Amino acid sequence: MLSSLHLFTMHITSITFSPSREYFLFVKRLVKSAVVLGSYFAYLAKERPDMELTKKHPYIRSRIDQERVAFSFADDSFDVSVLELPYIFGTQPGRKPVWVILIEQIKRMDKLPFTMYPGGGTAMLTVRQVGEVIVGAAEKSKGATAWPISMYNLTWKEFLKIVYAARGMGEDRKIISVAPWMMRMGLGGVKKEYAEKGIESGIDVDGLADIMDVNLFIPDRFAKELGATDDDIKSAIFDSIKVSQAVYDGTVELLGMKGE
């Protein structure tokens, strides 16, 4: 059964409302439980309704819809769990890490004596720990359950110190936290480019500043309940950033992340 579940979880990550229904109609005939790899932005939307995230961000709205559709299929003979996953560190052989975009962003400030970045923080875990909670959810979760997942919580300042160390620039880089309005000003060019190209971003550009200013932390007790064990998050961040830097520098060529 686990092989079917793993196949299902890999596909479900890249689909939203309508396709989700078709997948569940098919999968429910084959297995007794399903694990959906969701997003911790859904957790934030439920924890902070005052931020009105589903109104502002199509991506977050689609994740909430995905949970709703998934749970509609749960019954006495079919368990559905959604893992609300945060940022994941570690490498996947042959794949380009999503953190290349971070290198592109902070590289522009390398010549400055400091880096300006939002003042919030994020939950995170390693690739291995994701595998552990997937197996745990498949074996232990009952009914319709959303699991907010995290094993570590770092402020952006703490995280960037590790990033700069991984880039060979030491851990004493000065990080200046900026207010959301300043980040919105900095993203003005991106917003203009999207408007000119007719692009609707899954995460609203203006609203992103408010999300980045939040300490989006999650207790580790949920991940541990599903069987996650301790790992070296600093080493995992190092691995992700080193590969991302190599991709940025053009010294390696890897496949981009995509839905399959």
Question: For each of these PLM feature ranges, what is it?
Answer:
Residues D213-E260:
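Amphipathic terminal alpha-helices
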Residues V130, I134, I149, F159, ...:
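Non-catalytic, hydrophobic alpha-helical segments
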Residues L2, L7, S18-S62, S81:
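Conserved Rossmann-fold NAD(P)-dependent oxidoreductase catalytic core, especially the SDR/UDP-sugar
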Residues D50-A146, S150-Y152:
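Oxidoreductase cofactor-interface core, primarily capturing Rossmann-like NAD(P)-dependent enzymes
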